[in-house]
Structures are given as C-alpha cells and as structure tokens.
Amino acid sequence: MAKVIIIGGGVAGMSAAHELIERGFEVDIYESNPEYVGGKARSVNVPGTNQLHPDKFLPGEHGFRFFPGFYRHVTDTMQRIPLSGKNGKNSGKKVFSNLVPTRAVMVARYGLPSIIVNAGLPNTGVNMKQQLKGLKGSVDTGLTKEEKKFFLERMLQLATSCRVRRDNDYEKIGWWEFMHADEFSATYRSLIVVGLTRTLVAANAKSASTKTGGSIVLQLIYCGLQPWVNTDRVLNGPTNDVWLNPWKEYLTRKGVQYMHDAHAVQINLKDHLIDNVTIKTNLSNPEKARDIDVNGDYYIFACPIERMAELVSDELIENDLCFQYLKELAPSVAWMNGIQFYLNQNIEINQGHIIFSDSEWALTAISQVQFWGDYDLDMRFNGKVKGVLSVDISDWLSTKYKDVLAEECRADEVADYVWEQIEKSLNVDGKIIVERSMIEFYYLDRDIHWDDKIKRNIDKEPLLVNSINSWGLRPTASTDIDNMFLAADYVRTNTDLATMEGANEAARRAVNCIIDAEGNKSSYAQIFEFNDPWFFDVMKWWDRRRYDKGLPYSSKFPWWVKGVSILMGLFFVIDGIFKYLFYKLRITGEAGYIILSMVVTLGFAALDAWKGWGTWSAFALSIGMFIALSIYAFRLQDRFLKKLLLFGLVVGLVELLADNWLVNGIRVLVYPSDEPFLWASPMYMPIAWAVVLIQVGYLGYLISKSRGLVVGSVATFIIGLIFIPVFEFAAKYAGWWEYIPTKNMFMHTPYFIILGEGLICMILPFIFVKEWRLKWWYSILFGLFVGFWIFLSYFTAYNITG
C-alpha cells in the first residue's frame, strides 16, 4: 500500500492519519512539538507545578476546547477512537463519551447584571423551570426593540439567501457593515456586532467576512433551537488526558509512525512531483539538529498557514499559482491565546462559558473543574488549588486596556489586567464573585513569547481569520502537483472557519484526493454539510432566481413562496417533535422511528377516543404520520422506507375495493357522511392504510430478521389480531367509523374483521423481506397484490365466521 508523509501533527494531521491508516495506507507524521500532539488543541503539564508529586502537574492549555453542536467531522472521528479503562484495557467506550454538555451561557458586562441563558432550548423539566424563571425576571439587555428587530431581520436574510449570494456577495461585506453597526447603540455593537466576532473567531468586526461570521452565528442559532442537540459541549478533563493521548495511542497501535521535534524546511520537486521533503530533526536541541530527506508516495501538508507560507518556493508557485495566494493569505491571522488562573476555591460562576462582552481584550472563560468529574487537583502544585478558570484572550493587537495593548504587556501584566477586566464584569452591584486573593498561580500560554528587543510579545501560533475577500485566496485540498495535498484550516471547506472542525474536514478532503489519485477502492472519508433548516429552501431558490438576474436580496417574497415555506415549516415542526421524542426516549435509526410513529398513532387514537374530536382528527393523524415517515425517508435517503411508502400508497388505493364491499356490499361498515369521500371511503383512508401497514409490517420484518420468516409471520398475525382491533375500538369512540352491531363482535369489531386483519398482516413480513432487496417497481407489484389480498382476507374470514 502507498506511503503517505504528513507534515504537521495537529488535529488536521492526526485526522488525515486516522482516515488513511484505517484504509490500509502507510503513514508517517512529522510534528514540530517535542512532546505533545494535537497542535493548538493540546493541553500541557505546566512546568514547575509538580511540587508534591513528580507526575502531577497543573493542567494548562493554549486555549479551552469548545465543541458546538454543529461540529460533525471532528466528533465523528472521536466516535472512532477507543478509550482505555484505568487498567489499560479497552473500556468499550469511545473518546466521544468524554464530551459533556454545558447548561448555560453567561454574558458578563461592566457595571451591569450578567445575562444568563440556557445553552439551547430546555430539554429537561429542570432546564424548563430555569428558562421560565430567567424569562420572568430577565435582565435587561440594553438593546432597543428596533435593534432586536433589525438583528432578527439580518439573521432571516442570511438564512434565506441562496448559497451563491453568500459565497460571492457576503464574502465581500464586513460583519460591521452588514450589521449596520454605525447606526445603532454601543450596547448593540458590544453584544451583537463586536462581541460575536471577537469571541467566536478572534476577528475584527470591520474586516471579518459576513459569509463566515454569519454562517457560524446561524449554525449556533439553529443548534440552540433544537432541544435534542447539545449546543455547547466541553471535554470532561484536560484535553490530552481525555482525547489527544488516547488518539495518538490508537494511531500508533494501528501503525502510524509519529516523529516529534521535527518540521519541514524544504519541499524538493522533480518532474512536477514532490521527490522528497527535507526535515530538520531535534529542533529543541540545536547541537543535535540535522536535516534528513524523507520520501513517500504522497505528501499531506497539515501545518498552519504561517508555517506553510515559509515552505513556499518560486518553484512551487511555478507549478501551482495557489501557493502565491497562500503567501498573500498568511498575514490574515490574529491572536487567540489562553491564560489559566488556578484558584483556591472551586467557583463555578456559570454552568458553561462566560462572554465578557465589555472587556477590552475580548475575554471568554469557563470554570472547568465542574465538568471534570473525579479529576484530582489535591496533589498538584501546592495542594491548595481547587478550581481552574481558563480564559481566552482574543484581542491582543487592536484595543487598549489602561492605554496598553495586550501584546505590549509582560506575562504578569497580562495576568493582572485580564483579572481586572474579569472583576469589573463579575463583581457588580456590591456582589463579590471573584477576588485576587483566590489566585494561587496562573499560566500564560507559552506561545506568547516576550521579545526584549522590540518590547512586545510574539505569538508563535496565531490563528487564521476569515477576512473580507479571503475565500478567493484559499486553496482546495488538491494541488497541481499530483502527489501533494493540503490539510489545514485555511483549506476551502464547508466549515469555513479556523477550528478543529475545519481542520478535520480539510484532512478528510485531502484523504479523498489521495484515494482518487491511488485508484484505491476504499470508501471516501465522509464530508458533512451544515444542517440548514430545509423549510427555507423555497426562499433560497427564489433568491437564487433573483441573483441570476442581477437583483439584490429582498425579503418581500411572493405570497406563494411564503405559503409553501409556511407549509414546509409545519412539516419541519412535525419532524422536530419526532426528533425530540427520539431524544427523550433514546431511540435511534429507522426501526426506532417507525416504532415511535406506531406508539404516537396509538396514543393519538386513544386520546381522540377519550376526547371525541371527530373525523378531522383521523385526517390529521393519517396525513401527519405519512408526512413524518416521508420526511425521515427523504432526509436520510432511506431507500427501504421510500419503497415501503410507495408500497403502502398502492395498497391503500387498491384497498378501496374492499372498503366498498364492506360499506355497500355486505353493509357492515359506516363512515360519517360529513367528510370528503373517495368512492365509498373517506379521502384519507388510502394514507391511513399505508401508515398502519408500514408500522405493523415493519415489526414483523424486524422479528423475521432475528427469528426467521415463519416466526415473524405468526407474530405479525398475532399483532394484527391485537393492534388493529384496538385501533378499531378507538376509531368508534373518536367518531371516525363504526360497524353495524351483531352478536359476532369483540370490542365493537366483527370477528371476521379481526380474523381478516390478522390474515392481512400475516403476509407482510414475506413482502418486506423481499422488498428490501428488490427494485422499485416491485413495490407497486407487491402493493397491488396486498391490496387484493385485503379483499380476499375479509371475504374469506366473512365466510368462515358467518
């Protein structure tokens, strides 16, 4: 199998190695850090804090890790990293299980009460009470009605703009300009405009691209509106302990070679291909440092933009102009580095992240120990540390505090001034939440290096920011050098943000390019799209028509576009209700969805029998369930369920023959006369039959898969004898239909109907097992057969029971 050299052992490099090694490639990683993996995601052992035990250090970090609900690439990888137990053996769990949800987001302001909101919609009774309590005594944000209205209008514009407009027009507009920051109050700018960009992407609001900033804000909003999504997740311990070290162990156990303390210094080309890469080893020990040439079939460069720019030569640019653009992109970086305060009290402050919206240096923080379970701090440093407040500083270069920029301050001054901004934000109205006496120690990220010559700091690991018009400078994962690929957060991705998620996605794209180049038959690494609500799709389609005509965005949609969007919105709500029930009942997959729909159907019928809502409710239930099943089938491209829906519709239409015989032939079935009819049946009846047969038949299908067709058929026969008569009983008292009373009845249902419906259900497992494998047109054929089988079953049962 081909050998792949990966330059850079951060999240991008490790993600690429993960996908490659699982597909049988040989993988070598070269990482500049002499000890740690994971790049900027790493945690560290704070030097000199192992005073009480040689192996117990205080945990420090470049910056705290944050896993929003819209992250899908990196979390998918985490679900494939095994987690060892305390005995060193596989625990059966995955690293993903070390993610825990936060509960609230706090916005702390100078001299004003903090704003605290749930991190998403409440998903428990306790969270609901907290949310209602917060709304009842809610803190005034200081935003006017006009500002709130304008913010919502801007979000709606982003949500309903077509993809091309976002990629082209909004890439050229700064967030400041798009949000009309100059026209509103300082509070609006602080909370909505500047606060969001500085704390989320460490970017200046005036230069940050609306395409990127707007998309990320929308994703956070969408996550917050879905109670089954954990909007904000953190790790349950220091990053190395609970994620990166298990990841490295897994990769090396699979065969990845991981070389530390080494980085690339030159890319050597021959015949428009990389011949080899010159690596400098022993970086931390100059006396032992030496250059070596490493060879592979393919090369992935997973180093950050500033390092990659140093490797760009004139020869590279001659082969692919994208490398010239990389050099132009390299200055588009900002600083987002952390400082940790180790406190002699475990103060939670907030059950999640804290945004210091008025802080000059754009501070965000989280009190970490509350999420770390049984992590022991007692034997670390001086034994007095009880809590860790991890703070990210996102504005080092542009805004002054006490007339100085953060980059102009030595480490002690940075710590002092950051703490002052925290105190000003939290200690409000005479309440003392934090005070300096709590601090036992602090650790400033070692990437912040004080340079005595220039009397200011240097950041050794800055962060790429998505400034206006930077998308055009960013390369794809492939290059015109056929064995060279790029995997870093500056690569064009759906995520479009310098994050762990963007790095992981870029790595997957690079791996897919290698799979293509190698002609490998392995499956592609999965690429995820953003989860935009699909009920906006019609509005986006309309906006695309306007865009193609050269017209600007307009929120004045035609009435029919609004109407279709409202209808799709109703379907979206139904889908959301089902997802929430899945979340609460811990149901997953196709089987869970169909079984849950069966439970909801029975529950609704029972409630209707009690309340007697009448014929409209039967129509609503039938159509609603069919829509819910259709949404699931088409959203997840569930081919089997799509075929079952087609099968059910055909059965329902042919069943009208049997219904006519029951109504007009032997005259035992009576429907209310005040509803629209299709032949002798209510208009909804074909849909109702489709839903019920899918539900009952699927149960038989599941039983047949595990116990065999004979057992499945008998079980489905019994289910039909029980489920459908109960449904018939509910139908009578709900006012949907009823049977003419006779002596041969059980629960208001004639014996022959019960027997007939058992016979109907009995053959469904045979059909479903066959249909799973066969082509589409068999769904129609089977539907016709079962439709006639329904009539035959009733007719036979009628003659048997008299």
Model-flagged regions — what are they?
Residues 575-802:
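Aromatic-rich, lipid-facing transmembrane alpha helices and their immediate juxtamembrane interface loops
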Residues 224-235, 296-298, 303-474, 480-505, ...:
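C-terminal segments that line or cap access tunnels to active or ligand-binding sites in enzymes
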Residues 513-568:
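Active-site-proximal substrate-binding core of FAD-dependent oxidoreductases
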Residues 21-47:
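Glycine-rich FAD pyrophosphate-binding loop
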Residues 2-29:
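N-terminal Rossmann-like FAD-binding beta1-loop-alpha1 element of flavoenzymes
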Residues 150-273, 282-283:
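Active-site/ligand-binding neighborhood in enzyme catalytic cores
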Residues 287-298:
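Core beta-strand elements of the Rossmann-like FAD/NAD(P) dinucleotide-binding domain
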Residues 51-150:
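Dinucleotide-binding Rossmann-like beta1-alpha1 core, especially the glycine-rich loop
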